[in-house]
């Protein structure tokens, strides 16, 4: 609820505004189709757009000739809901309460995960998962990037395995 209230306050601003947090869609129809897709999936029982309670208007907005999708937080009752494991081209989060023992398998493949826990066992399981492209341990913003992250362009590290190798001469 608190996250939804906070994100509902994010609105379009001028691109040179230091407080700007949203990017406009180059093609307004893409924004409308994404919003319509979310609305269709919200018709499936077990999910609610929590930000809608805090937002003064619709998810799609026109501002100064550009089209924006406002941040959206959806709460799902189950990881099987169609919106529970979706990623979109705008600030979107699906919140699903699940037992820690089901993590990270319940996540499935994903581009970015932020882990906020002191449970070392859970952190180790999530670190071992091959399905997570980007993993933030702690409250790091997902937009904070580093050049040496494979997802951000350092393909050498991503494509080639570094390995220390030692051996004795003549050893088989």
List the model feature ranges, each with a label.
Residues 1, 27-31, 116, 120:
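Generic detection of long, well-ordered alpha-helical segments
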Residues 1-15, 38, 42-45, 130-134, ...:
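Structural signal for hydrophobic packing residues in well-ordered secondary-structure cores
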Residues 4-39, 50-67, 85-87:
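Flexible, acidic loop-helix segments that line cofactor/substrate-binding pockets
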Residues 8, 63-172:
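Conserved C-terminal structural/oligomerization subdomain of aldehyde/semialdehyde dehydrogenase
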Residues 12-21, 46-53, 113-118, 136-140:
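Flexible, glycine/charged-enriched surface loops at secondary-structure junctions
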Residues 16-17, 29, 39-41, 49, ...:
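Acidic-enriched, low-complexity/disordered segments with a strong bias for Aspartate over Glutamate
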């Amino acid at each position: 609820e608190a996250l939804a209230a906070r994100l509902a306050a994010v609105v379009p601003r001028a691109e040179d505004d230091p407080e700007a947090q949203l990017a406009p869609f180059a093609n307004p129809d893409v924004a409308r189709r994404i919003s319509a897709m979310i609305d269709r999936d919200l018709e499936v029982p077990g999910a609610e757009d929590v930000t809608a309670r805090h937002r003064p208007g619709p998810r799609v907005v026109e501002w100064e000739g550009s089209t924006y999708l406002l941040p959206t937080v959806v709460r799902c009752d189950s990881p099987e809901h169609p919106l529970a494991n979706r990623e979109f081209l705008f600030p979107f989060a699906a919140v699903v309460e699940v037992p820690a023992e089901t993590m990270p398998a319940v996540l499935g493949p994903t581009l970015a995960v932020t882990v906020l826990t002191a449970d070392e066992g859970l952190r180790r399981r999530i670190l071992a998962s091959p399905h997570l492209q980007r993993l933030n341990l702690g409250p790091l913003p997902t937009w904070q990037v580093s050049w040496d992250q494979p997802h951000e362009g350092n393909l050498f590290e991503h494509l080639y395995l570094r390995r220390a190798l030692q051996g004795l001469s003549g050893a088989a």
